[in-house]
Amino acid sequence: MDGARPKPSTTGRVCFLYIAQEHQTLHSVSAAVALARLRPDVEVDLVSTRPETIAFLEEVIQALGDAPVGLRLAGPAWLRGLTPAGGAPLKLPMLAANAAMLGGYDIIVAPERTTAALRWFGVRRAQLVYTQHGAGDRGGPFEPRLKAFDLVFAAGPKQRDRMVEAGLVPRERCAVVGYPKFDVVDALRPTPPRLFAQDRPIVVYNPHFDAKLGSWPAWGPAILAAFAAQDRYNLIFAPHIRLFEGADPRSVPSLAAFVDCPQIHLDLGGVAAIDMTYTRMADVYLGDVSSQVYEFLRVRRPCLFLNSHHVPWRGDESYRHWTFGPVVEALGDIVADVDAARGGHGAFLPAQEEGFRDTFDLTGESSSVRAARAIERLLNRRHRPG
């Protein structure tokens, strides 16, 4: 997997670009592998601004069965040196510094929207593909930068219809491909770790990083304290990686007291927090607006949601997932609320079934192959004679 490896009769160059932390790679790396296998005449490179991401990608590619892809670390090194611990190098400066190199590709595939800025930095020839990095309901991802992309992926009809109806993406530039991350998880088959000495039902608490939307600032420490004071449940605290940027919990004042609590496991950004290990092993999902709830619902189970901002959420498509379980409107006895969510799960099962079906189109070929074929079609149009 040498980024400089030659390919005979190359008919195109495709870059899969990663300028954030490792969690975003799982949404497209399997499509890169599938494309390289489908089209050995196409140069497929995975480019990242973080050496940690390059190492992680190499492991994942091996787990997927290897493929003729290149791995390339983007510079400059001095700009990487300005990166805070656990974070990613500044995205816009890195894009500006690498615009000339990236502009040499026919297609640039990215899991996040900041890559649209390449158009500002003079990249005109290369076509841009946005894969998404989640399939949630939050309104933030549905925004004008989508118009900069030549092709946008959707996991299913929900995402596609919302983007098209908002006028952000023409229907012909939107490809419904399913959810390639599921293919990666199935290939990795992470073994559930033994986290707790006592076997109890497991709750995964997964707050979002955005303080304007997430439950952590107002309610998070109190929730951890409540679980530390009971003995009926084990709790995995696995927030979005950007909430604490992968810090050591001992260095976070609001978390240090819970580090040695036998019924609480803290993970602020390890591999198990991004490869669905925790959402697969948990019995109950506790969260706010993270798209990970849909990954959890690959197997339908009880959910409980936290409205710490007292938003009027009913009927708002950005909160559709809050119809999949009870919503806590005022923090009281959170353990009793979990009990109630488990006991009343049957009432929410139809909404979970419908919501999952609208979110993920998993029919036909694997999601990774469908994504690769969509990129291949874009490449073929680019190189069509005349």
Regions found by a protein language model. Give the residues of each.
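Nucleotide-activated donor-dependent transferases that construct or modify glycoconjugates
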Residues: 3-22, 204-205
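Active-site and donor-binding regions of nucleotide-sugar-utilizing enzymes
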Residues: 19-38, 45-186
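Conserved catalytic-core segment of nucleotide-activated headgroup transferases in glycan assembly
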Residues: 24-39, 43, 182-255, 326, ...
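Structural loop-to-beta junction motif characteristic of Rossmann-like glycosyltransferase folds
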Residues: 126, 284, 300-304
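Catalytic cores of nucleotide-enabled group-transfer and carboxylate-activating enzymes in metabolic
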Residues: 140, 160, 276, 280, ...
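Catalytic binding pocket for nucleotide-activated donors in carbohydrate/polymer assembly enzymes
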Residues: 171, 291-359
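Donor nucleotide-activated moiety binding/catalytic core segment of transferases
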Residues: 249-294
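C-terminal amphipathic helix plus adjacent low-complexity
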Residues: 340-386
